[in-house]
Structure formats: structure tokens, C-alpha cells
Amino acid sequence: MTHLFEGVGVALTTPFTNNKVNLEALKAHVNFLLENNAQAIIVNGTTAESPTLTTDEKELILKTVIDLVDKRVPVIAGTGTNDTEKSIQASIQAKALGADAIMLITPYYNKTNQRGLVKHFEAIADAVKLPVVLYNVPSRTNMTIEPETVEILSQHPYIVALKDATNDFEYLEEVKKRIDTNSFALYSGNDDNVVEYYQRGGQGVISVIANVIPKEFQALYDAQQSGLDIQDQFKPIGTLLSALSVDINPIPIKALTSYLGFGNYELRLPLVSLEDTDTKVLREAYDTFKAGENE
């Protein structure tokens, strides 16, 4: 079995203009990603501000992306919530719209235990019968999918990958011991750790920064797969990532996507844009990165 994708999947932002989803900007952004070697597009995830999107908006965004991508790369829909039945219904709708896979975050707020996680994820996978990417992000959910639980879930025929945003390499190694990486993919959920994540056998990354540098971030993965040492190649990307860490995702990345012309620099409350001085510094860091490419 091949993996859902290898290399860089982009956690897509949602462009707004006057607080409305800007479909033309969305299409322009997706075209930019496809032209610059993105290997998958993840829609309606954390970076998309999914908590503040309506159901109708999520479906419109997903349908727009699916139609535009036209099977050139996988489109993965973020459909997970802390309500199993709502997650099932959202996932069924995503499948009906043509999504290639779904991504399911661990339940948050009400949370659960590990047995509950197994039942939650398996119930959705059983109902939808579409490839599932588990999304483990304890910094946002205060809930983790333990390695033993990943092992159980990896045996389900439709649960095929883990987005690992733990930034914990001991966790990665424990998971690796328990799964078949030929059929179950491990994707980093942290752009800043990809060098070591790839060295330790990860199949790719679900990336924020790839919204603006997809080609360069995919080139990093390709170089690693070719057996090259990518530490030096990563350094300018690492500098840009440091600038991007000025605030909570997706606040900074939208300062850059808007800079590239993909919608206004707008977020929905409770998220707010960077201060003007921070926006200027971040955009200058992007300009410096791009200028370095041309030297």
C-alpha cells in the first residue's frame, strides 16, 4: 500500500475579504500551491480557522478546492470535532463532495480516555469508509493519542496516517515501534522539526509555512530522500520560521498569504492580526528569504 502522500501537505489558510470567504483568492492560492509542488492540500483544519467557519462555508471551501485540484493531489478535509456523531456527519458530507481523505483531531474540552479515543475514531472510520489521518495536537486539545492507541487504530483498514504535532521524538519512536510504516504514514505537524523528523523516518509534514514556500519546503523533503544532508538547506527556512513564531498560528501566516495577494490580512475573532510593526518585520523576513534564493 502506498501512503496518502509523501512530502509536504499544506494546511490551507482561509482568505477573507470584509469577513467573507474570498473564493477567488482561495482559488489563486490553491493554484499557486499546485504550481509549486504541494503534495496534498488539507482544508478546514486549524490553520483554516475552522472553529469560526460555518458548516455552509466549510462545504463551499471544500467543494471549491476539490473541483480546482481535480485529483492532481489528495484533498484532505478536516472534519473532526469533540462530538462523534457530528464528526461522522461532517465526514460523510466531505466524502460526498469528493474529499480523498479526512483528518480527525482528538476530542477537546470534554476529552475522553484512550478507550474512548479508539471507539471515537473507529466509529467515524467505519461510518465513512474514507482514509483517515489522526491528528494529535496536545498543545491545543490537552489530550494525546498514546502510542499503544495509535497501534490499535493503525490496524483499522481506513486509518492510514498520523499528524504528529507533539514535537516529541520519544513519542515518535514509540509510535514507530508499534506500526507498519509501509502502510501507515507519520506526518510531522511542526514545521520547525522536519529535518530530524525526516531523519527518523517520517513520511512528510502537514505544514503551515508551505502556504507561502511550498516548492522550497518540498525540495527539502526531496533532498532528504535523495540521501543529502539538509541541515544547511533548512537554515534560511528556519530563520523564516523563527519570524513566523511571533504569535499563534494562523495569525502570522496570514500576514504572509495576504502579502502574496491571497485575500486581505483578516482573521475572525477571537483571533486578531499582528501589530503593524510585527507584520512589517515578518514580511521583511519573507523578502529576505526570497532574496536569498536568488543569490
Swiss-Prot record:
The record marks T46, Y109 as: Part of a proton relay during catalysis. The keyword Zinc-finger does not apply. Its main location: cytoplasm. SUPFAM superfamilies: Aldolase. The active site is at Y135 (proton donor/acceptor), K163 (schiff-base intermediate with substrate). It catalyses: L-aspartate 4-semialdehyde + pyruvate = (2S,4S)-4-hydroxy-2,3,4,5-tetrahydrodipicolinate + H2O + H(+). Pfam families: DHDPS. SMART domains: DHDPS. This is 4-hydroxy-tetrahydrodipicolinate synthase. It comes from Staphylococcus aureus (strain MRSA252). The gene is dapA.
